[in-house]
Amino acid sequence: MGYIAVVDYDMGNLHSVCKGLEKVGGNPLVTDQAHVIDGATAIVLPGVGSFDPAVQHLRARGLEEVLKTAIAKGIPFLGICLGSQLLFDSSEEGQETGLGIIPGQVKHFRSEPGLTIPHMGWNGLQFNQPDLCLWQDLPPEPQVYFVHSYYMAPLDPQVIAASTTHGSQTIAAAIAKDNVMAVQFHPEKSSTLGLKILANFVKKVALSDI
């Protein structure tokens, strides 16, 4: 049986992500080793914290190239929260360049009267890619859990898989292109609907591993 590499770079709540994957039948393996990531049937890049230290930690472990190579080979990939932002070229939060998998930038919410930043709590999703495997069997506008001050702003709006609105600002809540999927929210903290999203990812992994 293959395994899902959950990348450890000192920036993620790995326990809750692994617990969620295990609950839905996945076989997660926490690792910071390039050869382990290279042998995985899928990769999950979680993350909580700031952009620059995250990129620095990935590069210090020599993980940038193995992640890019795995993605180029078509390995199913799921980024979560900060892990989703690292796929982009850069962030307004820092000076480091990102992985550059998805062209675009990570931006900070604009201040507006009555708007709480960070965006923290439950919010509904609007599906831009309703047929994406992650959304299979979900209700319309499912409520998921967010904690973030920055958001993904891809150059190509076609890669936006779901959107959400905070104040007057509608932003990308998820992106998907080929084998790469990434969510700004925390599926592992989003109750039964979040577990369903993880289950859909695990199902895709199983199908791709046949």
Swiss-Prot record:
Q: Which UniProt keywords apply?
A: Amino-acid biosynthesis, Cytoplasm, Glutamine amidotransferase, Histidine biosynthesis, Hydrolase, Lyase
Q: Name one GO molecular function term.
A: lyase activity
- The EC designation for this entry is 4.3.2.10, 3.5.1.2
Q: Which reaction does it catalyse?
A: 5-[(5-phospho-1-deoxy-D-ribulos-1-ylimino)methylamino]-1-(5-phospho-beta-D-ribosyl)imidazole-4-carboxamide + L-glutamine = D-erythro-1-(imidazol-4-yl)glycerol 3-phosphate + 5-amino-1-(5-phospho-beta-D-ribosyl)imidazole-4-carboxamide + L-glutamate + H(+); L-glutamine + H2O = L-glutamate + NH4(+)
Question: What start-end ranges are recorded for coiled-coil regions in this protein?
Answer: none
Q: Which InterPro entries match?
A: Class_I_gatase-like (IPR029062), GATASE (IPR017926), Imidazole-glycPsynth_HisH (IPR010139)
GO annotations of cellular component type = cytoplasm
- Active site at 81 (nucleophile), 186, 188
Note the Gene3D superfamilies from the entry.
3.40.50.880
Does the record bear Amino-acid biosynthesis in its keywords? yes
Q: In which pathway does it act?
A: Amino-acid biosynthesis; L-histidine biosynthesis; L-histidine from 5-phospho-alpha-D-ribose 1-diphosphate: step 5/9
What are its GO biological-process terms? L-histidine biosynthetic process
What positions does the domain Glutamine amidotransferase type-1 occupy? 3-210
Broad class of where this protein is predominantly found: cytoplasm
Q: Where in the cell is it found?
A: Cytoplasm
Oligomer and partners = Heterodimer of HisH and HisF.
Record NCBIfam families: IMP_synth_hisH
Instruction: Describe the function of this protein.
Output: IGPS catalyzes the conversion of PRFAR and glutamine to IGP, AICAR and glutamate. The HisH subunit catalyzes the hydrolysis of glutamine to glutamate and ammonia as part of the synthesis of IGP and AICAR. The resulting ammonia molecule is channeled to the active site of HisF.
* Entry protein name: Imidazole glycerol phosphate synthase subunit HisH
Q: What is the lineage of its organism?
A: Bacteria, Bacillati, Cyanobacteriota, Cyanophyceae, Synechococcales
Provide the gene name from the record: hisH
